[in-house]
From Swiss-Prot:
GO MF terms, alphabetically ordered: ATP hydrolysis activity; GTP binding; GTPase activity; nickel cation binding
Keyword Transmembrane helix in annotation: no
Binding site for GTP: 15-22
Protein name as catalogued: Urease accessory protein UreG
Transferase is among the record's keywords: no
Upper lineage: Bacteria, Pseudomonadati, Pseudomonadota, Betaproteobacteria, Burkholderiales
Function recorded in the entry: Facilitates the functional incorporation of the urease nickel metallocenter. This process requires GTP hydrolysis, probably effectuated by UreG.
HAMAP family (UniProt xref): UreG
Quaternary structure note: Homodimer. UreD, UreF and UreG form a complex that acts as a GTP-hydrolysis-dependent molecular chaperone, activating the urease apoprotein by helping to assemble the nickel containing metallocenter of UreC. The UreE protein probably delivers the nickel.
InterPro entries: AAA+_ATPase, CobW/HypB/UreG_nucleotide-bd, P-loop_NTPase, UreG
Gene expressing this chain: ureG
Pfam families xref list: cobW
Gene3D superfamilies in alphabetical order: P-loop containing nucleotide triphosphate hydrolases
Annotated GO CC locations: cytoplasm
Length: 206
């Protein structure tokens, strides 16, 4: 179990544009902030829009949400050259020395994006049903190697013609023993399971 003497748990959240990463972050912060000391680092290419959205939503106090403008390719800032994010992590740790969890949201990326091990202790990859039922079987590191895959917006399946059983079957084939969760985080469906995963895999509970 982690204690205050341990470094904070760093949780990377990735996924394509519109999959629900920022909504998941908002819901996680609101559900976990009473129990844990939290900060968030968001990545956008040319703006700090996700930082603004989380601040307006009241996810955390504004000073606990830092926006990073990556420029160029968003994958590079979380993988090949994570220095800009590592610097942000260091700044947040100095500002909030008792922080328990640092959430790091990647910019909208494709299925090939992954977090550098030096940046993230746990990775959560978010895809959504509206992207099509074929997404899980397309694979890519985010789907096959993330610590947790979240198949989001299951409530939209009837409206986009996606088969949830097919998506579930494909996710099992692509991930093997690695866990995945199907739900709709905006509605709270699956949120408790995601929190439980973070707590158990991040050694936040004994």
């Amino acid at each position: 179990m982690r204690t205050k003497k341990n470094p904070p748990l760093r949780v990377g959240i990735g996924g394509p544009v519109g999959s629900g990463k920022t909504t998941l972050l908002e819901m996680l912060c609101k559900a976990m902030r009473a129990k844990y000391d939290l900060v968030v680092i968001t990545n956008d290419i040319y703006t700090k829009e996700d930082q603004r959205l989380l601040t307006v939503a009241g996810a955390l106090e504004p000073e606990r949400i830092m926006g990073v403008e990556t420029g160029g390719c968003p994958h590079t800032a979380i993988r090949e050259d994570a220095s800009i994010n590592l610097e942000a992590v260091d700044r947040m740790q100095k500002q909030f020395p008792d922080v328990d969890i640092i959430f790091i949201e990647s910019g909208g990326d494709n299925l090939a994006a992954t977090f550098s091990p030096e940046l993230s202790d746990l990775t959560i990859y978010v895809i959504d049903v509206a992207g099509g039922e074929k997404i899980p079987r397309k694979g890519g590191p985010g789907i096959t190697r993330s610590d947790l895959l979240v198949i989001n917006k299951t409530d939209l399946a009837p409206y986009v013609g996606a088969s949830l059983p097919i998506m579930e079957s494909d996710a099992k084939k692509m991930r093997g023993e690695r866990p995945f969760i199907m739900g709709s985080v905006k509605l709270g469906d699956g949120l408790n399971e995601i929190i439980k995963f973070i707590e158990q895999k991040g050694l936040l509970v004994s």
